[in-house]
């Protein structure tokens, strides 16, 4: 079905409503003396927010459909979007700030992928530029015996209702898998559903900070994004170009 197959819709459903980290990204962008690059930008939750406030933003994602949606949404903003892998991108400019929100650095496929990503980031940082990366542990939060059923992420669009509900969080080799039930209800009431999983590398702040020097990056004091009723909190690791 169209709804179940559209990555733009599901990215908007599962990521678009999160706002707890936006004040921190705005603060970091305001303190940066130059343009901002977001890697793993998706449909532009953060990039559009920053560009809408006048920041010069470039945004990359490996999914062409997500980038096409972002380019359309940001057509009138100081925003450039492109398709690229975070582990191998090459741009003709440098940035005062590079950001990786929502656990993007935990999608690199382990230490080797992170090393490639960090090298790319360092190559694109201006002198004294900063890389800011969000980390989270899906097992953090309320003890299982105290937790109620998770609420679905829901979005209505063109008469359709889309919902995505986390149904399991599993330990897997090298990380954590999050299973979600995706449901799409058409305007005439037809229900279609499918399962999807995303795997996050096990990664803590100390490990990422320890990997920085090999890429020419040194750790700055961390920042925190508090948990909300619907989302776990995150640690923002800051690495400065050495």
Model-derived features: positions:
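A short glycine-rich, Lys/Arg-flanked "PGG" loop and its adjoining helix->strand segment in the class I
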Residues: 115-127
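Conserved class I S-adenosyl-L-methionine
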Residues: 1-42
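C-terminal lobe and adjacent flexible extensions of AdoMet/dcAdoMet transferase-like proteins
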Residues: 199-242
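SAM-dependent methyltransferase
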Residues: 132-206
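A short acidic, Gly/Pro-enriched loop at the edge of an enzyme's catalytic core
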Residues: 87-97
